[in-house]
Each structure stands twice: as structure tokens, then as C-alpha cells.
């Protein structure tokens, strides 16, 4: 029986050694149930070579029914219904931690957005209440003016307050000229306005004062009960034609 059939390691050249090292780049190897002894021998050969660059990595399993597996130079048997060994779940734990951190960050963002929206809603409700409390005397328009910093804006309401009509100019010259302007160049209206302002109104005002004078002159004031007339006669000497 040759030394190779007995499973005894044979020293090889450097080229063969590099090919053996490249053949053992996989960290874990799946082996059938009938070849468990060969798997143990191969693990011993691997430890004999003393590969310093050997490092562990997560287990990769696809479509297994019932087989043996080498994990860190130890032969183990697994079934389909059996869970993956604990050493192979490290990568999944890291993934779960990343997922949990992402979900926690998303929940924080959502809670912050909800707080911001609630703050906006409370501010809108407060402004609506303040606007409802203000007495709306006149209709106005809203004017938004930028602030000095350029970031905030101040909002103000301008109300259009109705103003009283101007006091008319009661001077004769102004009233007469305005009346002439309203005549629109009509000769008949201009003559009528002139006759009214220069003849009729002076006659009425002068006649009124003359009528008042004649009332005081021809009014017969007697001593009986007319104390006002007596005081006028004594103090002012009015109505001297009347005798006591």
C-alpha cells in the first residue's frame, strides 16, 4: 500500500504547497456521511501544514439534506430541521443590530416630524383664536414685510378707515366759481347762477335785517309787563318816539 493511500503526508515542492494552500481557501467544507474518516485526516493534514493566514468566516449553507460539516477543525453533523450553529449567526446578529438602529433612527425622525406638525397646529390654532378675538371694525389687507435679518417675516394688517368728506368752502367766491364750473358752459345756467348769487341772495339778506329793525322800532312796549323794553329805553335810549 502506498503512503498516499494510508493518508500519510508527503513533503512536496513549493509549487505543490502553494496549490494546496489555494485549495484550502474556503474556511468550512461540506463532507458526506460516508467519508467522515477522510474528513478527519484532511483536517489533520491542514493542521500539519500550519497555514498562518487561516481565518474564520461566516458559514455558507445552501440546499443541505443531512451531512457533516467542519467548523474550526471540528466535525459536526447537522440536519435540515436543525438550526444553524451559533458561530454562524454572528453575521445575522450584526445585520439585526443594523436593522434595529435604522428602525430606531426612523422612529426618532417620525416622532420629530410629529412634534413639529403638532407645534405648527398649535401655533395656527392660537393665531386663529387671536384673530377671532380682535374686533374687525374695517376690512383690511394683510401685508408681509421682510425683517432686517432676512430670515423671519413680520405680518401686519392694514385697515382702510373711511375718511369724512372735506368741509365745503362756504366763501361766496368759491361757491360761485364752482357753480359756474358745474354749468358746463351753458349761457342760461351761467346767467341764472349770476342772478341768484349777486341779486337774490343779497336782497334777501338785506331785507331780513331791515325787517328785524322795523320790528324793534314799531313794537309798542308798555311799562306793564315789558321789563325788557323798559331796560332798553333807559339804558340805550331806544324807541325815543314812544312816551311813557
UniProtKB/Swiss-Prot annotation:
Q: Which residues cross the membrane?
A: 199-215
- What does the UniProt entry say about where the protein is found? Mitochondrion outer membrane
Regions of this protein lying in the Mitochondrial intermembrane compartment: 216-244
The effect of disrupting this gene, in the record's words, is: Abnormal mitophagy during nitrogen starvation. Decreases vegetative cell population growth.
Ranges of biased composition (kind: Acidic residues): 113-131
The record's Pfam families line, in alphabetical order, gives: ATG43
Region Disordered, residue ranges: 1-24, 105-131
Per the UniProt topology annotation, the Cytoplasmic ranges are 1-198
Q: Where is this motif: atg8 interacting motif (AIM)?
A: 28-31
Topology relative to the membrane, per the entry? Single-pass type IV membrane protein
- Point out the signal peptide segment: none
Q: Which GO terms describe its cellular component?
A: mitochondrial outer membrane; mitochondrion
| Region of interest (Involved in MIM complex binding. Required for normal vegetative cell population growth but is dispensable for mitophagy), residue spans | 165-184
Induction is noted as: Increases during nitrogen starvation (at protein level). Repressed in nutrient-replete conditions in a TORC1-dependent manner (at protein level).
Keywords in alphabetical order = Autophagy, Membrane, Mitochondrion, Mitochondrion outer membrane, Transmembrane, Transmembrane helix
Please give the subunit comment from the record.
Interacts (via N-terminal atg8 interacting motif) with atg8; the interaction is direct. Interacts with the mitochondrial outer import machinery (MIM) complex subunits mim1 and mim2.
Report the protein's function.
Mitophagy receptor that tethers atg8 to the mitochondrial outer membrane to promote selective autophagy.
Domain remark text: The atg8 interacting motif (AIM) is required for the interaction with atg8. The AIM motif is required for atg43 function as mitophagy receptor.
Name by which UniProt lists this protein: Mitophagy receptor atg43
Q: Which organism is it from?
A: Schizosaccharomyces pombe (strain 972 / ATCC 24843) (Fission yeast)
- The gene it comes from is atg43
Amino acid at each position: 500500500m502506498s503512503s498516499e493511500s494510508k493518508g500519510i503526508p508527503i513533503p512536496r515542492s513549493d509549487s505543490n504547497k502553494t496549490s494546496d494552500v489555494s485549495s484550502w481557501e474556503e474556511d468550512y467544507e461540506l463532507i458526506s456521511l460516508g467519508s467522515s474518516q477522510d474528513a478527519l485526516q484532511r483536517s489533520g493534514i491542514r493542521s500539519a501544514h500550519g497555514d498562518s493566514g487561516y481565518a474564520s468566516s461566516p458559514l455558507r449553507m445552501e440546499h443541505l439534506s443531512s451531512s457533516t460539516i467542519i467548523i474550526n477543525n471540528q466535525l459536526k453533523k447537522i440536519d435540515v430541521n436543525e438550526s444553524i450553529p451559533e458561530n454562524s449567526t454572528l453575521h445575522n446578529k450584526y445585520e439585526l443590530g443594523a436593522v434595529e438602529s435604522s428602525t430606531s433612527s426612523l422612529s426618532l425622525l417620525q416622532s420629530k416630524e410629529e412634534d413639529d406638525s403638532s407645534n405648527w397646529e398649535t401655533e395656527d390654532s392660537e393665531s386663529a383664536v387671536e384673530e377671532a378675538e380682535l374686533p374687525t371694525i374695517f376690512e383690511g389687507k394683510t401685508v408681509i414685510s421682510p425683517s432686517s435679518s432676512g430670515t423671519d417675516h413680520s405680518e401686519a394688517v392694514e385697515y382702510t378707515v373711511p375718511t369724512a368728506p372735506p368741509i365745503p368752502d362756504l366763501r361766496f367766491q368759491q361757491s360761485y366759481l364752482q357753480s359756474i364750473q358745474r354749468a358746463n358752459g351753458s349761457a342760461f345756467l351761467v346767467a341764472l347762477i349770476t342772478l341768484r348769487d349777486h341779486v337774490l341772495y343779497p336782497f334777501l339778506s338785506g331785507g331780513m335785517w331791515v325787517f328785524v329793525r322795523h320790528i324793534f322800532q314799531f313794537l309798542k312796549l308798555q311799562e306793564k309787563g315789558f321789563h325788557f323794553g323798559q331796560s332798553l329805553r333807559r339804558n340805550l335810549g331806544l324807541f325815543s318816539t314812544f312816551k311813557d
